[in-house]
Structures are given as structure tokens and as C-alpha cells.
């Protein structure tokens, strides 16, 4: 999408895949360029370094805005606010593709490269056109493969039929434009990586610090910091290099391929492939090196590398039924062979090879998109990181105050200029600890090692801290909450008037269609004849294939086929061989029953399963039939879809009742139907799918059991007890999802669930689809009183044929026709907890037609069913927008997009697609989720603790130095070394050794470093430490044996030893140990202190050593540390007592005031006030909505969404779903107000929101003022 004005404007918005890019055009100016280089030289490169850190300043400083026609650089900002500056490249007399894929010449080609994709400028604007006539497609940047986005299917078919391929000149032009077909991860030079690492702000500050220390003759610690920093830089570069090498080895692949060029088959390297090439697929498989469309035959591929689904998939050829349409990779995915997928087998024409036409190459392929998502991951948006820099800024402000104080005091004391400069700069290095980055990583590294021991692998360590803030977990159902496979339960055949005579079964009423009883076997011994249509449909309607003698395919198909006991062969046999060869059809599969050796059925045509169509079909031929044009279509799919395709006269009246009954008990249902076809082989191979998948005859239901994994219930209850919201996001039936949700604890059986549904085609007066709220019957057998005006059970209505026989009409023999649910009538149904469930189609309706309610529904819905992969991703992003920290757990099949979008994606698949998720568990169940969260909480608390410890250490040393600067003194090098190298370094290294607590706490840890509690803790400890040091500093000067410090005169060698310095050093030693113990938090997020045995040992040893240094210092100790002996033993004991009092006061302040009062009472009080404000805020009238501004139909105010999110989180924290939580008096009030906006008459039905009030955008300036 392009803003009006196209090339004549400076700014442009571009939709590129899943990202929205904002582009700005710039060019260099001579004056700005001269000024830039002058300032860089005058500041010795510091100015250039600052611009490197702030690229936006760099652009503003060096360049001037211009039109896109004159642009030399493009400044790009993505939807995560990550920016890049890329040069515009130009080439004269070049060729580019047109929309239909043909190449044409242009006077000049302009492009830039962004994240491995080339964006080409398309300029079709005539000079006489006005600005208003510029369309989105006339002038814009497009990727090289987005240009040819309207290739007609007939063009592809024509290329395939011609069998000529590209000419050498065409290949040369396309290779020049598209480039080589290689996914190459360039290894950046080691020197470049080293330089980039060194010039980061922290390391630049370290360079500044060690420079100051060397000038101050503090060489030992400076050298230690240099060594540690160099080691850290080398390790970081090594890890980056290792990841690049690993990624390159994983994705880089080239091999020889066969193509048709200029009518000749030839073998070339895969890196020479270009779009438009005719590719020959070998019969015994290969690794696809590009995205291509299959033109003939069928191909069996394994797409686990991209989707995580290890089940082989059958790809079919593009047919002429799409002749008039434009080819679309997403819609025609069943015809596309994706790069990186493994071709297992091809079924080819006799004497011919399977052909495919190359569509996309290199990074534009689906595999290339996955690689780019790994190379350029979504930045972790976590407040802790932002607060970290703000806190460092706070420390920098303190150091600024100390800087001014030092200059003033030292000028007053008459110090030399060099000493004033060195001491004032030294105070900055003391206040902002250079070792902070290394210390901060300790907790994350330890958590990562502990996760690895539990077979949970993390490729993004920075995500571990984010896991500590997780408050909602989304689970896929199949393979995640439930077992990966399905077990056969029963079949329910349909006995209709049409097939009674065939089955030789006499019913009481021959004109009725009804279900037979449950049958657990698919054999004649169980009442089903071996050649009954239901058995034949089950045996033939599947996508199984035989590879090396072994059946492969969807596990569900495999289970059902094996249940029939039939056999399958692939090849042409019998009388149909000649007919098949005549019409050049693909070799059919031969299905044979075991009970009759003479019978066999040939699968002539297969319509593969489509998630959008929710069904698959096959055309079957029986060679025993007299007529070769007597074929049968068998279809199977979701009960709803097959019902919509069936002749109503063949469907039992209680069909929906039976379907809902099974679904509510957690069974997965598959409906089966048939249709006789009067087609020959030629027509069967060419017929369109829509022409035959209609007017079907219902055959029955297959009932499959999807068992919940043994650990699922315990894990969900564990999360519920921890007040972590659990959400099911599944592609399965809504009622099946509800049943499994109840069984695994996401919805408690004793609680009522409400279904949010829509009725297609039923519109309100403003043309929007009506939404209804219905109460669901519990999966248990508890009886719920039906109130027709309050709740409509989904299984209470039945389908009855109309008297005219013209189809179904919904009627209800038990309750009234469904009516909207009002808030008043629902009031008595709402207890302390409630659950909402919604299906994907209804969710899509609400997103498009009622966008103002999306946030509220996402805050309270617990089951999202029939969700497509893109809807799963959309849901995760929606939860993130309303301030949830989201984890997504899936088995990799159709969950990749959601796993990538979540704050913490946890994959249960060991497929290569799992590299898109930060966490991968080798144990394929959800027990890893609480482990990841608990380790994340422990790491987060450790990061908080170690940061406050390092800040406390810096401020403690700052206070000590401020006292000594007053007398123109400073700590000796030995004292600094003992503090920095022994006490601080050792405690920082062992701080993160404390393991996570064995169970999840009911409340999450604090996530705001700049919260009142955190700031009060640091400032409070600073005050306590400052007071204690002042007492010791002042008391030392009052002793009768005290000798004042004599500062050096002019350039005299400075003797840093002093009694007051020794006294402050002695008491500060205990303070550093006290800070480590105070900030080393234990339960409920980390283990007890004694669980960290190394730190316990260090604490004991350091305390004893400090006592020895203070009370019984030897001559060696005095000389090494630079201490002055304090003559009085009583005073030395006094220092120890003061340290003990300091410990008691610090621990009491942290425990009683910070933890108990601020984090306990005060936080609960604020939450209570916020909930009361939310209840008063939620609007219940139509006018509330109309007043709220919107942009393109989406509410522009996020205030209500954020408040409702906080309320939704608080409801889950206050009321446990295990039934043991306390009553939440606000749950009913919020729910009633929400219901009044969903199905209540006050909002949607009697006074709905006018659509124009939601879709008319306001000017940005007005919106800003509204906010």
C-alpha cells in the first residue's frame, strides 16, 4: 500500500509479507556531508560513534528528504520499530518482469536490498497524470517476485504443454534480474564482528573506565576488566560465528537438477534455476531447491522442514479447471512443491516425466522466508530491558552529582588539575559498574544449563527472562494436549430409504433415514457387509501411498485403512490398463478387500484434503461394473461441511444431535458421503471438484477418540494454581475443543461455558452479521436447567425436513428458536468463574465487523476452535497488544507462525521448523511449560537481584569514596582489588546458581525494575549504608588515637593509606556481603539460600575472612591491602557490631517494608482500586462506542483494552480454575457488561453501532488530541 502521491512523496507504506514497512526517501547534501566529516574529526570519532548508536540522528544529520525518484538512500522502519538505511542501486537498460511473468525492458532499474530481498522500483506513471490518479500499483517498491503476481493459470499450462522451456537469452536476462538460486548465509568477517562488538555502548564505557584506571595507577583491576571484556567479546563473536556457520550448513544446499530448455532435457546446477524453468522431478525423490508448481502427475512430499508435520503429503497437478484464474501460491498450495521439502515419490505418466514450473528461487521461497525469520527475529519487547537502561541513566545522574561534588571539594582542598580530573572521572566509573553486562548474563546462563539438563533446548537465551513474566499460555490441542494419533472408536452407519434395498435391511419405516447402532468393527461379522459403501469409502477415500512397500500418510487415514483389513497396490492392472493409457491418466491405486479376492477398486482421481474446504474426495471405479463410465465419488470431512453438501433426504433427522453429543464427549467426528457419477476416465480426470462434490448421499459417521496425554491435566492444574491463564487454540470442532478443555482442566466441569456464535446470512439492520451467546451443556452428565430466554444448547435443536422436501430448516422441538442473550437474563447464571468459547469463523466475523470487541473477547475467551494458522498468529498478537505476556506451545504442525509471534514459543517437535521457536522440548508433552516458566521466573528474579546488587555495590563504593574525597583521600589499590576482584566478582558469579523453586507461585515476580518497590529497595539500602558509613567515618575521627590523613603536596607521591579509609573499608566489606544476601531472594521463585551450596560456602568463607581482616589483621594483610592498623581492639569489635546491626536493619527493611508492605499490601490495594475503576469504566450503552474514535474500523483508543486485559488477568489470578480459588465479586459485573455488548439487546440488536461510526477515519492530528 502506498500513500497518495507515490514517487512525488517522501514517505511510503509497504506491505511485505507479514511485515509493514515504512519507507523514507533521502539523498545526501554537500553541506551536511562536509559538516558530518568535520565534526567527526574534531571529536576524534566520538560524534560518528554516537550517530552509529542512533541511526535516526545519522539520517537527519547527513541527508535531506527527497522524492523516491531522486532517492539515493531508503530509510526503512518495520512494524517492530527496527530501522535500517539501505542505498539505492541503479542500472541502465535493464529488464524486469511484468505482472504475467514476461520480461520487458526499462530505461533504468532501481532497487535496494533489505533483509536478503531485492525491492525494485516500479514506475508506470505518465508525465501528464495528476497526483490524484496515482494508484497503489503504479508507483511503489516491490520485491522481485511480487512484481509477477498475476500469472494466469492458462499461461503455466501453456508453457507445460509446449514442453519447450526458456531460451538461452531469456535465461540470461532472468538470471541477471533474479540472481542465482542460492540461500547463502554470508559469514561476516571476524574483524567486523569484533569491531561491532567493541563499539557497543557498554564496551565503549569499559574502554573509558580502564583508561581512567590506568591513569590512576589502578592497573591490576583495569587489566582484569580488560581480560574479562576481551574474553566476553571473543565468546560473543565465537557464538555469533558458530550460529552463522550452523545456519549456513543447515540451509545451504545445491544439487544437480534436470530441466527442459529450448526443447532439450539437460542437467544443470540448482543454483542456475530461474523462474519459468521447466523442472523434471525424478521418480524416486529429491530435495526441492525452489518453489515450483506441479504441472502433471502427483508427488508425495514430506514438508516437516517447513511445517513440522512429518506426515507425507500428496501434491496434485495444476488442472485446467483453474484456467481462467490467476495463480495464487496460498490458494493453490496443493499444487506447489516448496523449497526444502523432500520429494519421496512421484507417480508419473507412462513414458513421461513429472514436470513442474519454477515459481520462486533463493530467499523468496518459503524456505527462504523461514531462514530470514531466523536471521532477523522479532525483537523481544520486554520492559525489563528498557527499565535497565533507564536505571543506568539514574546511576549516571548520581555519578554526575558526584562528579560535580568531587570537582568542588578538590578545588577547595587545593588539589592539582590532573588529580581533580582523574578523581572526578573515576567517580563515574565507580557509580556505573563496567562489569554489569557480564553479571547480568549469569542468571540466564545458569537457567539455560538447567533447562538443557531437562532436555529443553533454548536458541534465544534472552527470551528466558521474558518467560518469567508469562501470564497466559496458548496450547494447540492435537499432539500437544492430546495424543498425536487418534484411536478408532465406532462407526454410525446411516440407513436411508435409498440404500435399504442395496443393504437388504428392512426398516420399520422405509421412508425414514436414520442412524444404525454403534459398530466397533468394519467387517461383515459386525453387521456391515465387506463391500458396503461405508466400508468402501473408508478403504478408498484417503491419501495413503506405498513407499518401498510400506504405507505412508496421515495417521488417521492409516488407522482407518488398517481397521478395514483391506490391501492397497499401486499400478495398472486388469481391463482398465488400455483405457488408462488411452487417456494418459496417472497410474491408479488398487484397493482390494480381503474377504473377496476377486473384488478390486481403482482410485482414478483424488481431490486432496483442504483445510479451507474441510474435506477430501476420491473417484473410484469398480472393474466388475458392466459400464466403464459408472464411477463413484466418496467424500469425507467435517460433519458440518459434508452436511452442507448432502441431499437433505439422506441425512437423519437427529444428525446434529448425534454430532453434538459425540463432540461434547471429546470425540473427533468424520462424516462420510458418496455420489454415483456417470463419467468415463477422460471426464473423470478433467472434471472440476465443485461439479461433483454436491448432492451427496450421507453414509455415516466415523467416531475417533483423541486421548488426553497423561501429564496434561496435572500441568494445566499446576498453571491454574499459579494463576496463569490457559487458552486452547485448535483447528478442531468447537464442541470437541470444549470437551477436551474440560477434560484437561482449562474449563472446569463444574463451571458453565458460553459459546459465542454467529448465524451466516442473518444480518442486523446495518448489514452486519448477528452474534449470539449460548450456554454450552457440560461435558459431564450434570443437568442444566434450560431457560429458553436465557440459553440455547447447541445440541437442543434438530433438523427436520420441510413438508415440501426442499431442504432443511432449523426447528426446535424442546426449546424456542435461538434468541439473543441479554445481560439481565444471564445474571443468575454467572458464578465466581465463567468461560467463553469461540470458533474461527465467528472470530473472523467479529474481527472484521465488530473490531471494538476483539480485545475484550481475547481477554476472557478460553477456547478458540476451528482456528486457521494465520488466525492463531493473529490471536497471539492480539493478546500481546492488550499487555499479556504470551507463551505458545505447539507440536510444530500449523503452529509455526504462532510460535514465532509469541513472546516465548515452545515447540514439542524436533523437526527443523522448531528452530523458529526459542524453546524446543525433546519430551513431547507439556510438562516443559511450567519448567520453562519457573526457570524464567528464577532467571528474572536473579536478574533483578544481581542488578540491584551491582547497583548497590556501586552506590556503596560511591558513598565510601565520597566520604574519603572530603579528606582528599581514596581507597588503596589493595582495598579496591579485594572488593572488586574477590567479593563482588565471586558473589556475582555464584548469584545465579540458586535453582528455581520446585513449584510455581500463585503470583508472578515483579517485572518492572523501575517500580516503587525496586527503587525504594535500592534507595533505602543506600540510605542505610550511607548512615552506617557516616557513623564509622565520624566515630573514627573522634578516637583519641586517631591520626588525620595528610594529602600529598603538588606532585608528591600519594600515600592512600588512612585510618578513616581503613575503617570505611572494614565496614563496607560486610555491607557487600549483606547486599548479596539481601538481594539473593529465595522462595517462592527461587530455592532457599542453602540450595545454592557454592554461594553458602562463599558467604561463610568471606565472612570469616573479613572478621579476620578487621579483628586480627597480620602484617602481611595490612601490607597487601594497604590498611592502617587501628590500635583499639574495642573499636575494631565496634565495627563488627555496626556491621551486624547494618545486616539486621537491611534485612528487616527489605523483608518487612519492601516485600511485605510494598509488594504485598500496597500492590493488592492498587489492583483492587484498578478493578473497581474498570468495572465503572466498561461502557454499556451505544453512545459510549460512537464517541470513541476509530481508524479503518479499529478502535483507536487502547485505554479500555488495556484495562480489560488487566481485569481479565486479575480474574484469573483471583479465581483459580481448579475450583479452590476465592470468590471474585467483579467477575459477574464485568461479564454482564461484556455480554450486553456481545448478545445483549442494549448494544447489538436493538441499538447496534452504525457501521459508518466504525469505519470513518479521523485525521491523525485530531486523534492525537483525542488521546
Swiss-Prot record:
GO cellular component: a single term: plasma membrane
Gene Ontology BP term (one): intracellular calcium ion homeostasis
Membrane association type: Multi-pass membrane protein
CDD domains: P-type_ATPase_cation
Coarse class of the protein's main subcellular location: membrane
Stretches of the chain found on the membrane's Cytoplasmic side: 54-189, 239-390, 446-950, 998-1013, 1080-1097, 1154-1267
Compartment annotation: Membrane
Magnesium is among the record's keywords: yes
Keywords: ATP-binding, Magnesium, Membrane, Metal-binding, Nucleotide-binding, Phosphoprotein, Translocase, Transmembrane, Transmembrane helix
Gene3D superfamilies referenced in this protein's UniProt entry, alphabetically: Calcium-transporting ATPase, cytoplasmic domain N (3.40.1110.10), Calcium-transporting ATPase, cytoplasmic transduction domain A (2.70.150.10), Calcium-transporting ATPase, transmembrane domain (1.20.1110.10), HAD superfamily/HAD-like (3.40.50.1000)
Active site: residue positions: 476 (4-aspartylphosphate intermediate)
GO MF, one example: metal ion binding
Coiled coil regions in record: none
Positions annotated to bind Mg(2+): 891, 895
Reactions this protein catalyses: ATP + H2O = ADP + phosphate + H(+)
TM stretches of this protein: 33-53, 190-210, 218-238, 391-411, 425-445, 951-971, 977-997, 1014-1034, 1059-1079, 1098-1118, 1133-1153
Annotated EC: 7.2.2.-
Entry protein name: Probable cation-transporting ATPase catp-6
Organism encoding this protein: Caenorhabditis elegans
Annotated gene: catp-6
Amino acid at each position: 500500500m502506498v500513500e497518495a502521491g507515490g514517487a512525488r512523496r517522501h514517505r511510503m507504506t509497504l506491505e511485505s509479507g507479514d511485515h509493514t514497512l515504512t519507507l523514507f526517501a533521502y539523498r545526501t547534501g554537500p553541506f551536511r556531508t562536509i559538516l558530518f566529516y568535520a565534526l567527526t574529526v574534531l571529536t576524534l570519532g566520538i560524534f560518528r560513534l554516537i550517530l552509529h548508536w542512533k541511526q535516526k540522528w545519522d539520517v537527519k544529520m547527513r541527508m535531506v528528504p527527497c522524492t523516491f525518484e531522486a532517492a539515493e538512500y531508503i530509510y526503512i522502519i518495520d512494524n517492530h520499530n527496527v530501522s535500517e538505511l539501505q542505498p539505492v542501486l541503479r542500472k541502465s537498460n535493464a529488464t524486469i518482469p511484468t505482472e504475467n511473468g514476461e520480461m520487458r525492458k526499462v530505461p533504468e532499474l532501481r532497487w535496494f536490498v533489505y533483509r536478503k530481498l531485492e525491492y525494485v522500483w516500479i514506475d508506470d506513471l505518465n508525465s501528464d497524470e495528476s497526483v490524484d490518479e496515482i494508484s497503489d500499483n503504479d508507483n511503489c517498491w516491490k520485491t522481485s517476485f511480487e512484481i509477477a503476481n498475476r500469472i494466469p493459470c492458462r499461461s503455466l499450462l501453456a508453457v507445460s504443454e509446449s514442453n519447450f522451456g526458456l531460451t538461452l537469452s531469456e535465461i540470461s536476462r532472468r538470471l541477471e534480474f533474479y540472481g542465482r538460486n542460492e540461500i547463502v548465509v554470508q559469514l561476516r568477517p571476524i574483524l567486523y564482528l569484533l569491531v561491532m562488538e567493541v563499539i557497543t555502548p557498554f564496551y565503549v564505557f569499559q574502554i573509558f573506565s580502564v583508561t581512567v584506571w590506568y591513569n590512576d595507577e589502578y592497573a591490576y583491576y583495569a587489566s582484569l576488566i580488560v581480560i574479562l571484556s576481551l574474553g566476553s567479546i571473543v565468546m560473543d563473536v565465537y557464538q555469533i560465528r558458530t550460529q552463522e556457520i550452523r545456519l549456513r550448513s543447515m540451509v545451504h544446499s545445491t544439487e544437480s537438477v534436470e530441466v527442459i530448455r529450448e526443447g532439450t532435457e539437460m542437467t544443470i546446477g540448482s543454483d542456475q534455476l530461474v523462474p519459468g524453468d521447466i523442472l523434471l522431478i525424478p521418480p524416486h525423490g529429491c530435495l526441492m531447491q525452489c518453489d515450483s508448481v506441479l504441472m502433471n502427475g502427483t508427488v508425495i512430499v514430506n514438508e516437516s522442514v517447513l511445517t513440522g508435520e512429518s506426515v507425507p503429503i500428496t501434491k496434485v497437478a495444476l488442472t485446467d479447471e483453474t484456467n481462467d484464474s490467476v495463480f495464487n501460491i496460498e490458494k493453490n498450495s496443493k499444487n506447489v512443491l516448496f523449497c526444502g521439502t523432500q520429494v519421496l515419490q512421484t507417480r508419473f505418466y507412462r513414458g513421461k516425466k513429472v514436470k513442474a514450473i519454477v515459481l520462486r528461487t533463493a530467499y523468496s521461497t518459503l524456505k527462504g522466508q523461514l531462514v530470514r525469520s531466523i536471521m532477523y527475529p522479532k525483537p523481544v519487547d520486554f520492559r525489563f530491558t528498557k527499565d535497565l537502561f533507564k536505571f543506568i541513566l539514574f546511576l549516571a545522574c548520581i555519578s554526575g552529582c558526584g562528579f560535580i561534588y568531587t570537582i568542588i571539594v578538590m578545588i577547595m582542598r587545593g588539589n592539582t588539575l590532573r588529580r581533580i580530573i582523574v578523581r572526578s572521572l573515576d567517580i563515574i566509573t565507580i557509580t556505573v559498574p563496567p562489569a554489569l553486562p557480564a553479571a547480568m548474563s549469569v542468571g540466564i546462563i545458569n537457567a539455560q544449563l538447567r533447562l538443557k539438563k531437562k532436555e529443553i533446548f533454548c536458541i534465544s537465551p534472552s527470551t528466558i527472562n521474558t518467560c518469567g513474566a508469562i501470564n497466559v499460555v496458548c496450547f494447540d490441542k492435537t499432539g500437544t494436549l492430546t495424543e498425536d494419533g487418534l484411536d478408532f472408536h465406532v462407526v454410525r452407519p446411516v440407513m436411508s430409504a435409498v440404500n435399504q434395498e442395496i443393504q437388504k435391511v428392512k426398516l420399520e419405516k422405509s421412508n425414514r433415514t436414520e442412524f444404525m447402532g454403534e459398530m466397533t468393527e468394519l467387517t461383515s461379522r459386525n453387521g456391515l457387509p465387506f463391500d458396503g459403501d461405508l466400508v468402501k469409502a473408508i478403504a478408498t477415500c484417503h491419501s495413503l501411498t506405498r513407499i518401498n512397500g510400506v504405507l505412508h500418510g496421515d495417521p488417521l487415514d492409516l488407522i482407518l485403512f488398517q481397521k478395514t483389513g483391506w490391501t492397497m497396490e499401486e499400478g495398472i492392472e486388469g481391463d482398465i490398463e488400455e483405457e488408462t493409457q488411452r487417456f494418459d491418466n496417472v497410474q491408479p491405486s488398487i484397493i482390494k478387500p480381503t474377504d473377496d479376492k476377486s473384488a478390486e477398486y481403482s482410485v482414478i482421481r483424488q481431490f486432496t484434503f483442504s483445510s479451507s474446504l474441510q474435506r477430501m474426495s476420491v473417484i473410484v471405479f469398480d472393474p466388475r461394473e458392466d459400464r466403464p463410465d459408472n464411477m463413484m465419488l466418496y467424500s469425507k470431512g467435517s460433519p458440518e461441511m459434508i452436511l452442507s453438501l448432502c441431499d437433505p433426504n439422506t441425512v437423519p433427522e437427529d444428525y446434529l444431535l448425534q454430532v453434538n453429543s459425540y463432540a461434547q464427549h471429546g470425540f473427533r467426528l468424520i462424516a462420510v458421503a458418496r455420489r454415483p457419477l456417470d463419467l468415463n476416465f477422460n471426464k473423470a480426470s478433467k472434471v472440476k471438484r465443485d461439479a461433483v462434490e454436491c448432492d451427496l448421499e450421507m453414509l455415516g459417521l466415523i467416531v475417533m477418540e483423541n486421548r488426553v496425554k497423561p501429564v496434561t491435566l496435572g500441568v494445566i492444574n499446576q498453571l491454574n494454581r499459579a494463576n496463569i491463564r490457559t487458552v486452547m487454540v485448535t483447528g478442531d470442532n468447537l464442541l470437541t475443543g470444549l470437551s477436551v478443555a474440560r477434560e484437561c482442566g482449562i474449563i472446569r466441569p463444574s463451571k458453565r461455558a458460553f459459546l459465542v456464535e454467529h448465524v451466516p446470512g442473518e444480518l442486523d439492520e446495518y448489514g452486519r452479521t448477528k452474534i449470539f451467546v449460548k450456554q454450552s451443556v457440560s461435558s459431564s452428565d450434570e443437568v442444566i436447567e434450560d431457560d429458553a430466554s436465557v440459553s440455547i444448547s447447541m445440541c437442543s435443536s434438530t433438523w427436520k425436513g420441510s413438508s415440501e422436501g426442499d431442504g432443511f430448516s432449523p426447528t426446535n422441538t424442546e426449546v424456542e428458536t435461538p434468541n439473543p442473550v441479554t445481560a439481565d437474563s444471564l445474571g443468575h447464571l454467572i458464578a465466581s468463574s465463567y468461560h467463553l468459547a469461540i470458533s474461527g469463523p465467528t472470530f473472523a466475523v467479529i474481527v472484521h465487523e465488530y473490531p471494538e470487541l476483539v480485545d475484550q473477547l481475547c481477554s476472557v475467551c478460553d477456547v478458540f476452535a476451528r482456528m486457521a494458522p494465520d488466525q492463531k498468529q493473529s490471536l497471539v498478537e492480539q493478546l500481546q497488544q492488550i499487555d499479556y505476556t504470551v507463551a505458545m506451545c505447539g507440536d510444530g504442525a500449523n503452529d509455526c507462525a504462532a510460535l514465532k509471534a509469541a513472546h516465548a514459543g515452545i515447540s514439542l517437535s524436533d523437526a527443523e521448523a522448531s528452530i523458529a521457536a526459542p524453546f524446543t522440548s525433546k519430551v513431547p508433552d507439556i510438562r516443559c511449560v511450567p519448567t520453562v516458566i519457573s526457570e524464567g521466573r528464577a532467571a528474572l528474579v536473579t536478574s533483578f537481584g544481581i542488578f540491584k546488587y551491582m547497583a548497590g555495590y556501586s552506590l556503596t563504593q560511591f558513598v565510601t569514596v565520597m566520604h574519603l574525597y572530603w579528606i582528599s583521600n581514596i581507597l588503596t589499590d589493595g582495598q579496591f582489588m579485594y572488593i572488586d576482584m574477590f567479593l563482588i566478582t565471586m558473589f556475582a558469579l555464584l548469584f545465579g546458581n540458586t535453582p528455581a523453586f520446585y513449584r510455581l507461585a500463585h503470583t508472578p515476580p515483579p517485572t518492572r525494575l523501575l517500580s516503587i518497590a525496586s527503587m525504594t529497595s535500592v534507595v533505602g539500602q543506600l540510605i542505610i549504608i550511607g548512615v552506617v558509613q557516616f557513623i564509622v567515618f565520624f566515630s573514627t575521627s573522634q578516637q583519641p588515637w586517631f591520626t588525620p590523613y595528610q594529602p600529598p603536596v603538588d606532585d608528591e607521591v600519594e600515600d592512600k593509606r588512612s585510618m578513616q579509609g581503613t575503617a570505611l573499608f572494614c565496614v563496607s566489606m560486610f555491607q557487600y556481603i549483606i547486599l548479596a544476601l539481601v538481594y539473593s531472594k529465595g522462595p517462592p521463585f527461587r530455592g532457599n539460600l542453602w540450595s545454592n551450596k557454592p554461594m553458602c560456602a562463599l558467604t561463610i568463607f568471606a565472612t570469616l575472612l573479613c572478621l579476620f581482616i578487621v579483628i586480627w589483621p597480620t602484617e602481611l594483610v595490612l601490607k597487601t591491602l594497604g590498611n592502617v592498623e587501628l590500635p583499639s581492639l574495642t573499636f575494631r569489635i565496634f565495627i563488627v557490631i555496626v556491621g551486624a546491626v547494618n545486616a539486621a536493619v537491611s534485612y528487616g527493611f527489605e523483608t518487612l517494608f519492601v516485600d511485605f508492605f510494598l509488594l504485598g499490601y500496597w500492590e493488592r490495594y492498587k489492583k483492587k482500586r484498578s478493578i473497581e475503576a474498570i468495572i465503572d469504566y466498561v461502557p454499556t450503552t451505544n453512545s459510549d462506542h460512537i464517541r470513541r474514535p476509530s481508524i479503518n474500523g479499529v478502535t483507536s483508543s487502547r485505554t479500555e483494552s488495556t484495562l480489560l486485559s488487566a481485569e481479565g488477568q486479575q480474574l484469573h489470578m483471583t479465581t483459580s480454575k481448579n475450583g479452590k480459588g476465592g470468590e471474585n465479586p467483579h467477575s459477574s459485573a464485568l461479564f454482564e457488561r461484556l455480554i450486553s455488548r456481545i448478545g445483549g439487546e442494549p448494544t447489538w440488536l436493538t441499538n447496534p453501532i452504525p457501521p459508518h461510526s466504525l469505519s470513518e477515519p479521523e485525521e491523525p492530528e485530531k486523534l492525537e488530541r483525542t488521546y
